[in-house]
C-alpha cells in the first residue's frame, strides 16, 4: 500500500487544517520545495499536494511552487485545489505533475471529468471530500448534498483513474480513518481508492491493510508526519510494498 505524504499550501507555506477549517491552519514549514525533497529522500513513492488557496479562489494560486516541486522530484506528484477547467489542468500536467485531482468540478461539471479523462488517460483522479457521508465542495465550504458513494460510482464510470477519499470530520484530528466509509466506496467501484483523513498512528495505518484487497491502494498522511506521531520510514516498512507482513482479507495476519 502506498504511503503518501501530504503538503498543503496556503499563503506559500506548508500548513495543516483541522477539519477543513482555514481559520485553524497550523504552519509546519515555509519552504514547500524543501519539504517535498525531505519526504522524497525519506522514501516516499508519491507526493500529494493541495493548493488550499486555489481551492478557495477557484483557480491555482501556488502553481509556481507546485511546478518546481514536480520538476525537482523524481517521484510522481498528484495535485488538487482550484482545478476547474480544461486549460488549468493541461498546464498543470504540462508542468510535470503526474496526476490532477478534480474536486468541485466533479460535482458541478461531471462532463468535464469525462472529457479530461479521455484526453489525459490515467492522469485524472477525483477527490471525494465528505462530511458525514455527504460531499463538500469549494474548499470544503459548501455541502453538495451528494453522497460519497454515489459520486464515486459516477466518477469511476466517467473514467477517473483513482479516487482520493477524505473524511473531513477526521482531517487533522489524528483519530483514525473512517474504515466503514472507505469500505463502502471501495466496494462500489473497480478503480483504486486512496484514503485520506484521520491517520494518527502506525496502528491506524495497519488498520487499512485489510482493505487493500478490496481496492484501497494507498493512504495520504499529513499532520501525523508533521507532528512526529508517524515516522514515514516506519510507515513504509509497516504497510508499504516492501513490508514484512501481509494482512489477509479476513483480517488475520500472515507472513508475506
Swiss-Prot record:
GO biological process: L-histidine biosynthetic process; L-tryptophan biosynthetic process
Lineage summary: Bacteria, Bacillati, Cyanobacteriota, Cyanophyceae, Synechococcales
GO molecular function: 1-(5-phosphoribosyl)-5-[(5-phosphoribosylamino)methylideneamino]imidazole-4-carboxamide isomerase activity
Highest rank taxon of the organism: Bacteria
Keyword check for Isomerase: yes
KW Transmembrane helix (keyword) present: no
Organism of this sequence: Synechococcus elongatus (strain ATCC 33912 / PCC 7942 / FACHB-805)
SUPFAM superfamilies: Ribulose-phoshate binding barrel
UniProt similarity note: Belongs to the HisA/HisF family.
NCBIfam families named among the record's database cross-references: 1-(5-phosphoribosyl)-5-[(5-phosphoribosylamino)methylideneamino]imidazole-4-carboxamide isomerase, PRK13585.1
Active site: 8, 129
Gene (name only): hisA
EC number assigned by the record: 5.3.1.16
Pfam families hit by this protein: His_biosynth
Keywords from the named record: Amino-acid biosynthesis, Cytoplasm, Histidine biosynthesis, Isomerase
Protein name: 1-(5-phosphoribosyl)-5-[(5-phosphoribosylamino)methylideneamino] imidazole-4-carboxamide isomerase
Involved pathway(s): Amino-acid biosynthesis; L-histidine biosynthesis; L-histidine from 5-phospho-alpha-D-ribose 1-diphosphate: step 4/9
Subcellular localization: Cytoplasm
The protein's enzyme class: isomerase
Gene Ontology cellular component terms for the protein in this record: cytoplasm
